[in-house]
Amino acid sequence: MIQMQSTLDAADNSGARKVMCIKVLGGSHRRYAHIGDIIKVTVKEAIPRGKVKKGDVLKAVVVRTRKGVRRPDGSIIRFDRNACVLLNDTTEQPVGTRIFGPVTRELRNAKFMKIVSLAPEVL
């Protein structure tokens, strides 16, 4: 469950290391974002010469959460850290060209096939 002020790791090579959620998109009073949801983030920590810099505001899709996701068979997939992949604001395509760490199958249903294909492991 990601809400406003939550900090996440950037799971791509866009240049961001830590980002903070400033808005959960998809509804006027929506409080929480789960895996596959789009949020608005600001870059809090970035590496030098990256594609994004500290202070940039852009969209991101949540790919891993501590809360996890429940599957229809009753199993729950949980992760150690909250992580997201930064997206271009207009096209909603990934800013980076590589994805680090596993992602879940739920992203495939949410029309993020580009992220699923770039990921090293799909759970």
Swiss-Prot record:
Gene3D superfamilies: Ribosomal protein L14 (2.40.150.20). GO terms for biological process: translation. The keyword Metal-binding does not apply. GO terms for molecular function: large ribosomal subunit rRNA binding; structural constituent of ribosome. Belongs to the universal ribosomal protein uL14 family. Binds to 23S rRNA. Forms part of two intersubunit bridges in the 70S ribosome. This is Large ribosomal subunit protein uL14.
